[in-house]
């Protein structure tokens, strides 16, 4: 893979690539843009059930290069242990590319709203934490029993 600009000391924004099975990635991106407006630093790669691994890897590589703004790239995948995560993990590069699994809509919105200059590692933690905080058992919450998070 060609080198991605490292986020250390860079004023660039952390960019993102949502990678998923089926059309989940495209739909998450579309939903986020409907809620907060369009943005250019996050894109989606949907891996079809019968897609070739090398072709998927090349598509992710192109997406990373397309959105990179100098602050690193966060690959957000749908499920730990799945093909999208396994392929995305090939791109891990300290300070330049990180992978967070279990992507949901609050995570995409969080990344979209981060300001330039936030280091990649911090952005990854903030996005992960936002995803966790967005998970509730609605029945418990409505019954006053708290939340899962």
Feature-to-residue mapping (PLM):
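N-terminal loops that bind phosphate or other acidic moieties
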Residues: 1-149
């Amino acid at each position: 893979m060609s080198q991605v600009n490292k986020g250390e000391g860079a004023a660039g924004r952390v960019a993102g690539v949502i990678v998923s099975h089926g059309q989940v990635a495209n739909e998450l991106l579309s939903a986020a843009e409907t809620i907060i407006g369009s943005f250019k630093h996050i894109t989606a790669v949907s891996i079809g059930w019968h897609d070739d691994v090398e072709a998927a890897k090349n598509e992710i590589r192109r997406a990373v290069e397309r959105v990179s703004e100098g602050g690193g790239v966060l690959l957000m995948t749908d499920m730990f242990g799945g093909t999208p995560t396994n392929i995305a993990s090939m791109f891990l590069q300290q300070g330049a590319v990180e992978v967070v699994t279990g992507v949901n809509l609050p995570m995409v919105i969080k990344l979209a709203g981060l300001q330039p200059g936030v280091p990649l590692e911090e952005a990854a933690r903030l996005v992960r934490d936002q995803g966790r905080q967005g998970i509730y058992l609605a029945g418990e919450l409505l019954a006053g029993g708290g939340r899962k998070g």
